[in-house]
A protein has these predicted regions:
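Bacterial N-terminal signal peptides that target proteins for export
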Residues: 2-13
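Bacterial N-terminal signal peptides
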Residues: 11-22
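N-terminal periplasmic/intermembrane-space "pro-region" immediately following the signal or transit peptide
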Residues: 27-162, 528
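Outer membrane beta-barrel
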Residues: 128-297, 312-330, 367-382, 386-388
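Outer-membrane beta-barrel proteins
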Residues: 154-158, 219-221, 249-253, 293-298, ...
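Detector for outer-membrane/organellar transmembrane beta-barrel domains
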Residues: 326-471, 528
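Outer-membrane beta-barrel "beta-signal"
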Residues: 509-528
């Protein structure tokens, strides 16, 4: 609309200038030299009265004033447009800086360079691949990331591969494990780099995100190495790739420094195909996600009979959520349904340990804007076999005594006869029930200082043939003070605590640490 007004204004000015020029030429032609004696046919058409000449001069002067006014109007319009463009660029930088991956929300997992925004939306992603059928509109690409140093002192100990995190499952499971106590640590593994793009098309907006960090896991656990976080795209209401699980709520993550985060929070990046039929005030999202599970063979872990058991995951996990966004915050309900199967591939005995179980879970989350300075972030989740979706994932499947277990009677056997073993396995696998919760408060003291404080817990309902030292309960607590002295920089101190309780041997362990972190962020947006 501003461009239309601008074009109309320019056209008006040009027309007025042409008209002024014509009138000026007419006056000059009439007043410069004495007119020749007109013929009788010209007398009626040629203005001889000086009043007519003065009237034309007055009209020219009025037109010149009009031109001056229109020039001022053009200057005002251009100034307004420049201010609007500057505001849009600032808003884009603020969204990118907070990375409310709402588009892609990446807390600490959240990429925050300023105090938390109580009204920050969640969203999908925010390509540069252009085809001739694209709708007219603005294309954009954002390059962003941060360099981050974590340093601190751990008063106890944990698994050395996870030296810069607080994970209750990685605390000692027996006396002397990971000894000795007390260590200073430093690392830059949280550092991150990402690219987002947005392209309008006739099918809706095409969005992509490609993001890496330096936090090694899996075979690279403990290393500072590149690790893929997101490789995901959306077109209209459909998305595909690796992105935050649809079973979780990224807005429930607090504004903390500790990398791994609350252990009882659903926090998982998974490969998926997603459909988002409703967005905005009320949202619905459905997805098919890559299945996966981990198993604990408990007191039978050393048995040869169990050596050939392999996961047999034939169906994807089905996840969904509904979300209600309001001025005071939001409420979200998420669900998961899937199947866990395992196959005994060892044919050397007569016992088949193959089995299956259902995995299912329900999660309720909420972000409440108590006021502009206080934001509450809450989650409660219950289910079975869903442990790998939790932030600090213990095992999904545990060994349980089989009540139908019997031995084949062998009262008489001739010499050299092959012994007959059990025909029904002594144990069966069962999906382990689990409950997790997280409750945090983000408080803004001023434009320069914020605090996050809260507690999280995960509790397993262990099966009766798990090992006595199996993980049962984990607890997590964090409190911090963060300082934002200038744009794109934050530093601060944080107290972190974690505790582990075992299943049956009464052993427990904990760790307390003080951490100081320095985050230097960058972002650059391009539009065309």
């Amino acid at each position: 609309m501003n461009q239309i007004r601008h074009g109309w204004t320019v056209a008006t000015v040009l027309s007025a200038i042409v008209l002024v020029g014509l009138c000026s030429q007419s006056i000059q032609a009439q007043t410069a030299d004495p007119p020749k004696q007109p013929t009788d046919s010209q007398k009626s058409d040629t203005p001889q009265d000086p009043a007519d000449v003065q009237q034309l001069k007055d009209r020219v002067k009025q037109l010149e004033q009009t031109v001056d006014e229109l020039k001022k109007l053009i200057g005002t319009v251009e100034t307004t447009q420049q201010k609007q463009q500057q505001q849009q660029q600032q808003q884009q930088q603020q969204v990118l800086a907070s990375d409310t991956s709402g588009g892609l929300r990446t807390v600490n997992a959240v990429f925050r360079t300023g105090p938390p925004n109580p009204s920050s939306p969640r969203g999908s992603v925010t390509s540069s691949t252009i085809n001739t059928d694209d709708e007219k509109g603005e294309r954009s690409m954002d390059i962003y990331g941060f360099m981050m140093l974590d340093t601190g002192y751990s008063f106890k100990t944990n698994h050395p591969d996870w030296f810069d995190t607080v994970r209750p499952t990685k605390l000692p499971g027996f006396e002397g494990e990971f000894a000795p106590n007390g260590k200073w640590y430093m690392g830059v593994r949280q550092s991150r780099f990402g690219v987002k793009t947005s392209t309008p098309t006739k099918w809706g907006e095409l969005k992509t995100i490609f993001e890496f960090e330096l936090f090694g896991t899996g075979v690279d656990a403990g290393q500072t190495t590149f690790r893929l976080r997101h490789a995901y795209g959306e077109l209209g209401n459909f998305g595909a790739g690796q992105y935050w699980t649809n079973f979780g709520d990224t807005d429930a993550f607090p504004n903390t420094f500790e990398y791994w985060g609350p252990n009882g929070l659903i926090w998982f990046r998974n490969v998926q195909i997603k459909w988002m039929p409703f967005r905005g005030r009320n949202e619905l999202t459905l997805a098919l996600e890559r299945p996966g599970a981990s198993g604990d063979q408990g007191v039978y872990a050393g048995r040869i009979e169990l050596a050939g058991i392999r996961p047999h995951l034939q169906l994807p996990d089905f996840t969904g959520n509904v979300r209600f966004n309001r001025d005071w915050g939001h409420i979200q309900a998420s669900w998961l349904l899937g199947s866990i199967k395992w196959k005994d591939t060892d044919d050397s005995d007569k016992v088949d340990f193959s089995g299956s179980d259902v995995r299912a879970g329900l999660s309720l989350t909420s972000v409440l804007n108590f006021n502009k300075d206080n934001i509450g972030r809450f989650q409660a989740t219950y289910g079975q076999g869903i442990q790998n979706y939790f932030n600090d994932a213990p095992l999904d499947v545990g060994a349980k005594a089989n009540p139908d277990f019997i031995l084949t009677p062998t009262p008489h056997r001739t010499e050299g006869e092959t012994p007959t073993g059990s025909i029904i396995p002594p144990i069966v696998g069962r999906a382990i029930p689990v409950f997790g919760m997280s409750a945090f408060l983000d408080h803004t003291w001023s434009k320069k200082f914020t605090t996050a404080v809260g507690y999280s817990m995960l509790n397993m309902e262990n099966t009766n043939r798990q090992a006595p030292g199996a993980f049962r309960r984990g607890q997590y607590f964090v409190a911090n003070l963060l300082w934002y002295p200038v744009e794109n920089f934050v530093m601060g101190g944080e107290y972190q605590w974690g505790r582990r309780n075992n299943f049956q041997d009464t052993f427990s362990s904990d760790d307390s640490r003080i951490q100081f972190s320095f985050k230097y962020s960058f972002n650059k947006g391009f539009k065309w």
